[in-house]
Amino acid sequence: MKRNRWWIILLLFLVFLPKTSFAHAYIVKSSPGENSELKSAPAQVEIEFNEPVEEGFHYIKVYNSNGDRVDTDKTEIKKDNHHIMTVKLKKNLPKDVYRAEWNAVSADGHPVSGVIPFSIGKADGGFSSQKAADSALNPGTAADRAILYTALSLFIGTVFFHLFWYKGKSEQLVKRTRRILTGSIAALGLALLLQLPIQTKANAGGGWGSAFQPGYIRETLFETAGGSIWIIQAALFVLLALSVIPAIRKNRFSSFGYWTAPLIFFFGLLLAKAFTGHAAVVEEKTVGILMDFLHLTSASIWVGGIAALVLLLSKEWRQPDKTLAWETVRRFSPWALTAVGVILFSGLLNGFFIIRSMDSLFHTAYGQALLVKSGLFVFMLVLGAIHFLLTRKQRRTGISRTLKAEWAIGIAVLITAAVFTSLPSPPEPAPEPFYQTKAIENGQSVSLSISPNQPGKNVFELRVTDHNGDPVKNIQQITLTVYKTGLSGSENKSTFTLKEKTKGVFQDQNLSINEKGNWKIKVHGLTGDFNEINIMFTKTN
């Protein structure tokens, strides 16, 4: 028994120990470009996305003005760069207006599609603008996730209720516990079962008939990351369902020995779920997945714990002596407080990765849903704080009504989370040139500009001026050392020398900034009187 207890304590420690959508895929650039007028026929259409796209359900179909296909019907994703999708065109295409219809499944498992119009020769008519399909809410996905999140919270809340918070014995409580556990397992299985056809329908872009076509289901399962993760989730669910049978049959709800294996499978399910959301494709992928895992775990424990207090203690609150109910709430309070802290920490960190501007927060459906969820979270937090304060002074009156209110808000939070995780997260703000000035000794200053400040070729320009703003002319040499920072940063540094454009102004083009993220640029200069300039700039793109 002691050995099993240590195993469960170690498991919980690993869950709560912080370790080290952004959006659906969108086009970074394409060739031909949107609304471009080409002088001659291109050999192929190439589309580059901001993130890798899946092997399944991808295509580029190119049509002329008569609606005839003019591509070779063989769309490929580059083996050395899964961001790029190409299709070759038929030879010697005549002057005409064309449209390239594309479809792909982004790394976070969401299908995206659109149209790129272009012409060979002058376009007589107007172009239709590029559109991105499936950017609205998918009701099926949202409903499925609402069922999933509710089932997860009910299960873990009920299990932890008996393992850690409740110390009484009641035959009626045993019956209610069995019903809740059985119902939550059934709901969890239903959510996972529905997830496959819902995802297949979204990937195929058709009606519900396509959701059950064997070919499409096979493509979802074996040619998308979401399908592989679904197989893992299904296996973990079967193991979870089988492992809880002994505990339910023997009514061993407070035995660590009976619940060690089910909890391992349960938290494995949560971890697998974290691999399918927006957090799985943020730049700091490891951090995003772990924060999503901690966020979902903590929310499940908090909301599920409140649900257990409402559903399992309903009769205890009606008793003249409410000591047992109050003691249970008192034991739950530090768990709730810890869960709230983890929710805040993980939510803010992942929000930083996904919401890159205030405009995205207030003027996109994703940001607005996140604000609604945050508002509900605050209401729930206020009620939780009231309950925490009440536990410090045990009262004769119960708190069943306010617990029900907190649980109702918690369910609303889970539903809102299901909605906004089904929405496309905001695209990155358009890159802006970097410009920063820093002071050095003797009243001089160093100004660095980087344009266009995005992965690829950038123009680096550096100016050294005196206290009057005039160029310092005795600079002999300027070198820049560029390297990426952060958890995914590389120790490899790129050093290059800027060429003197005019006195005090040094410039050069360079490909050192080859991906998005946080970068440091170390400036080293040497003056004519052998003094050194050493200063560091930090930028994000």
Curated annotation (Swiss-Prot):
Q: Which UniProt keywords apply?
A: Cell membrane, Copper, Copper transport, Ion transport, Membrane, Metal-binding, Signal, Transmembrane, Transmembrane helix, Transport
Residues the record lists as binding Cu cation: 24, 110
Example GO molecular function term?
copper ion binding
- What Pfam families would the database entry show? CopC (PF04234), CopD (PF05425)
Q: Which domain of life is it from?
A: Bacteria
Signal peptide, first to last residue: 1-25
Q: What induces it?
A: Highly induced under copper-limiting conditions. Down-regulated by CutR/YcnK, especially under high copper concentrations. Down-regulated by CsoR.
Inactivation phenotype: Cells lacking this gene show a growth-defective phenotype under copper deprivation as well as a reduced intracellular content of copper.
Is Ribonucleoprotein included in the keywords of this UniProt record?
A: no
The transmembrane residues are 146-166, 180-200, 228-248, 262-282, 293-313, 335-355, 370-390, 407-427
Compartment list = Cell membrane
A Gene Ontology cellular component where this protein is annotated is: plasma membrane
Q: Which family does it belong to?
A: In the N-terminal section; belongs to the CopC family.
Function, as annotated: Involved in uptake of extracellular oxidized copper under copper-limiting conditions.
What this protein is called in its record is: Copper transport protein CutJ
